[in-house]
Amino acid sequence: LVIAARHFGCELAVEELPSSDPDHLATIRLVGAVTSDAVDHELFAAMPHRRTTRTKYEDRLLPEELRHACCNVATERGTELALVLDEGKRAEIADLVAEGDRIQFADPRFRRELAAWVHSRRSATQDGMSGESFGMPDVLSSVGALVIRTFDMGKGIAAGDREKIVNGSPILAVFATRDDGPKDWLTTGRVLARVLLRLTASGATAAFLNQPIEVESLRPRLKELLSTVFTPQLLMRFGYGSSAHQTVRRPLDDVFM
């Protein structure tokens, strides 16, 4: 919202976590005019094209200038974006992701929740993920949801993710914060939004690999592997890959009160 406003020459003031209501994340006010710059326009233009690409990426790095620009977004917010290019370290992180897959898929509650979000793009729900996210045609999304809910596919998912990281992810990216509370989570989201748009504007893409952070026992191991005093909040892959279909989302009128 702040990025879009700047594109239109509007300055917004954001008050984060303004009340004791945990669902009241921010109060946003229009405070005046601002002179937009080229970056504002580039990020705004990238919004309709932003996708999560879960396939393997090309074996080439993002340009150094783009990597620095993404890291600077995090630094400006007092957070850290660690880019992992080392092959050995990426393999170690791949092992953590695979272990997280096995742990999560062994839990029927996790499988039920994941399956509940798998819908065809033609579904009336207009949210969630298509079965294409799991390598199947969109028309088989309902079948895919049934399979996910019923069977523990952790070993297969783990093997596929590990292969994709080792041989199809030239850069792993870890967003991290000094502390680990609601304000840190909100800041991470704001940094993430800007970084993803920066990648999209440059023709790159990204995907989430957050298993080592979602599984409580693995998060300290990821932190130790990164040799950081910051707390990991998000693990992602950055690179160049094939374009993905747009994910269906609810109309604007459905999400405004």
Residue ranges with predicted function:
Residues 2-257:
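Acidic, surface-exposed loops and disordered segments
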